[in-house]
């Protein structure tokens, strides 16, 4: 992240000049994208492969269980639609092989934060996706060809110029497919008006029944101060209808010692609010040695603030790993950690209000998929057909979110090209929840059909629900396919598949195996401000059982099978930290006779890359490509330090 900011001023000015060069200043410009497809409702027709043939009610409707607290009567019909049996083609069935096996999640959705909302929202967007897919098929059949000149569903960038609303009160820029790590929003304008204060809000989509959308990031610039100070201040916050405003984060801070780090950068740059010296020529005096008049410099003390009334500012909000970074005129100013359940993929609109004369706004690095007809190496990227007669040595489940198109393509072009993967000895699947945006879901569906390596989850993706994906990987590796070992990793991790297989063979253990970077002495984080905060209600004990770090760990088939069995019996304790959850599940299985064998491997790097790695985490698509090139050239695990 730090390397990015050194050149940000140059990048910002290039953006400014580029926008002025190519965009008519009098015409708001926005790259077109389709919005109608997902709203089309098609009358069911039994000749269509996605038609619903038979409704199978989930267990919570059949049995007198106390689950109405989780799913209300009004939502039962919507949720039941998730698990309708469908007559689909083999190609369309492939992404849904794990789907119905997770139906029992509905019974205990309330056990995790956002669980109930994730399933209810999934019911709504799934119905919309089915309608959109059927509508597209009708169009293709009627025209007998794919529509030429297809507009992008998820554009890579969007821009507007001088685009305030008619009443001059605000600007709104739609973000159809959310934000992802590396996305940035550059705002060029001038604080003006009587007050010169303004706000930038990144909002999501309102939940059904809620008139106002959640505010994922609220960036409030108060040039004349507020009730707490007369000096200019930046206030960062978030808002939801259920929780109202969160705790304010101010810059400059009242207490500089409370300046925490987000992505290794200060929440508030210490220079904001600090004194700066400026000199001015106030009078002339004679140089006593030469008799020459010279300017006498008088010192003026001012406090630094990045925005100034009447002066042009170039401000950029950039999505990092942990939060949002704000730079102004090339200087890092603030960082804002994403609040619990408010994640960047939820952003659907940017709103700018107040005394701010907008010159331009540019959203770039947006998540977008590659159109299959433009992918030169398409066949080499498709998942190989797996033979039911040949058991797999390893299933690798990759956590990914719906709009992380670029990360998935990077994985397909790099370590998924290992011979062991292409030959069918190892199967790799992305486990992806639904998105709240119909456009993203349609892109995801097309991607899943094209490459055959995506497993869709029957819930909307929230970070608090990732242990549901861990469960899904266990089910896929034992019930959908049959593998000796099951591995979990992330879409920003580079995996040396050959080294993993070699290490597993050297353990000479196929039962009770937990292989990874083992943590045998860790405690729950009790700080509510932490992303990994765990309350005493969630975990009352002082320590966790042994667990393996999430970027890359492996369990043997018997453990994965037992996890699936606990789930079917309703005895699987859900825990929001998925890697710790696996450790908790194994500890529970130990009480019932499992003899665990922990294999620690320090070559699994959970916080970046080190030479000799087996798994390297936090790698961008460009870094993944570089690591693959290094491996092909040297057959060694060498990091790309130049990136």
From Swiss-Prot:
Part of which pathway? Protein modification; protein glycosylation
**Name of the protein in its database record:** Beta-1,3-galactosyltransferase GALT1
What species is this protein from?
Arabidopsis thaliana
> Cytoplasmic compartment: which residues?
1-6
Main subcellular localisation: Golgi
Taken from the record's topology, the Lumenal segments are 24-643
* GO process annotations (BP): Lewis a epitope biosynthetic process; protein glycosylation
Q: Which InterPro entries match?
A: ConA-like_dom_sf, Galectin_CRD, Glyco_trans_31
Gene responsible for this protein: GALT1
Q: Where expressed (tissue)?
A: Expressed in stems and siliques.
Cofactor(s) the protein requires to work: Mn(2+)
Keywords per UniProt: Glycoprotein, Glycosyltransferase, Golgi apparatus, Manganese, Membrane, Signal-anchor, Transferase, Transmembrane, Transmembrane helix
Q: What does this protein do?
A: Beta-1,3-galactosyltransferase that transfers galactose from UDP-galactose to substrates with a terminal beta-N-acetylglucosamine (beta-GlcNAc) residue. Involved in the biosynthesis of N-glycans containing Lewis a structures (with the combination of FUT13).
* Glycosylation site positions: 45, 87, 144, 162, 277, 287, 508
């Amino acid at each position: 992240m730090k390397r990015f900011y050194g050149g940000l001023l140059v990048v910002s000015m290039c953006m400014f000049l580029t926008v002025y060069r190519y965009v008519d200043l009098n015409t708001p410009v926005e790259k077109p994208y389709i919005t109608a497809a997902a709203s089309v409702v098609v009358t069911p027709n039994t000749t269509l492969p996605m038609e619903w043939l038979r409704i199978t009610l989930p267990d919570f409707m059949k049995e007198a269980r106390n689950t109405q607290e989780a799913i209300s009567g009004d939502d039962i019909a919507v949720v039941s639609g998730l698990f309708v049996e469908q007559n689909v083609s083999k190609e369309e069935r492939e992404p849904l092989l794990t789907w119905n096996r997770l139906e029992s999640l509905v019974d205990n959705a309330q056990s995790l934060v956002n669980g109930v909302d994730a399933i209810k929202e999934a019911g709504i967007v799934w119905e919309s996706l089915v309608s959109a897919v059927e509508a597209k098929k009708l169009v293709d059949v009627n025209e007998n060809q794919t529509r030429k000149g297809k507009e992008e569903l998820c554009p890579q960038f969007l821009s507007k110029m001088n685009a305030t609303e008619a009443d001059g009160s605000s600007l709104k820029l739609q973000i159809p497919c959310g934000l992802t790590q590396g996305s940035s929003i550059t705002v060029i304008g001038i604080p003006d008006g009587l007050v010169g204060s303004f706000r930038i809000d990144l909002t999501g989509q309102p939940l059904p029944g809620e008139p106002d959308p959640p505010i994922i990031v609220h960036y409030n610039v108060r040039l004349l101060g507020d009730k707490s100070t007369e000096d200019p201040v930046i206030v960062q916050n978030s808002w939801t209808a259920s929780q109202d405003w969160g705790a304010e984060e101010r810059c400059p801070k009242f207490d500089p010692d409370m300046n925490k780090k987000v992505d290794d950068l200060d929440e508030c740059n210490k220079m904001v609010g600090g004194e700066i010296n400026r000199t001015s020529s106030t009078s002339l005096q004679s140089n006593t040695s030469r008799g020459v008049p010279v300017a006498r410099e008088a010192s003026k003390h001012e406090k630094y603030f990045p925005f100034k009334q009447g002066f042009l500012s170039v401000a950029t909000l950039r999505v990092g790993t942990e939060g949002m970074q704000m730079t102004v005129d090339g200087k890092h100013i603030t960082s804002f950690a994403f609040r619990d359940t408010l994640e960047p993929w939820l952003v659907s609109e940017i709103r700018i209000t107040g005394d701010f004369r907008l010159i331009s706004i540019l959203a770039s690095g947006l998540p977008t998929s590659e159109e299959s007809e433009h992918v030169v190496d398409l066949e080499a990227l498709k998942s190989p057909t797996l033979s039911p007669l040949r058991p797999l040595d390893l299933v690798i489940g990759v956590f990914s979110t719906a709009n992380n198109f670029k990360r998935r393509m990077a994985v397909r072009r790099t370590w998924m090209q290992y011979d062991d993967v292409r030959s069918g000895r190892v199967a790799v699947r992305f486990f992806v929840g639904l998105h709240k945006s119909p456009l993203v879901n349609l892109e995801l569906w097309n991607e899943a059909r094209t490459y055959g390596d995506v497993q869709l989850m029957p819930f909307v993706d929230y970070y608090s629900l990732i242990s549901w994906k861990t469960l899904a990987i266990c089910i896929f590796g034992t019930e959908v396919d049959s593998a000796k070992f099951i591995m979990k990793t992330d879409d920003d991790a580079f995996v040396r598949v050959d080294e993993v297989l070699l290490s597993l063979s050297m353990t000479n253990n196929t039962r009770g195996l937990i292989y990874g970077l083992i943590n045998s002495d860790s405690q729950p984080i009790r700080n509510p401000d932490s992303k990994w905060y765990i309350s005493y209600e969630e975990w009352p004990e002082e320590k966790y059982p042994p667990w393996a770090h999430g970027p890359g760990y492996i369990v043997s088939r018997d453990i994965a099978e037992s996890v699936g069995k606990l789930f079917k019996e309703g005895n699987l304790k859900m825990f929001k930290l998925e890697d710790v959850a696996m450790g908790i599940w194994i500890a529970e299985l130990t009480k019932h006779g499992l003899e665990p064998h922990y294999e620690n491997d320090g070559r699994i790097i959970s916080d970046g890359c080190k030479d000799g790695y087996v798994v390297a985490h936090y790698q961008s698509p460009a870094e993944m490509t570089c690591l693959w090139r290094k491996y092909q050239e040297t057959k060694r695990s060498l990091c790309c330090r130049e990136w």
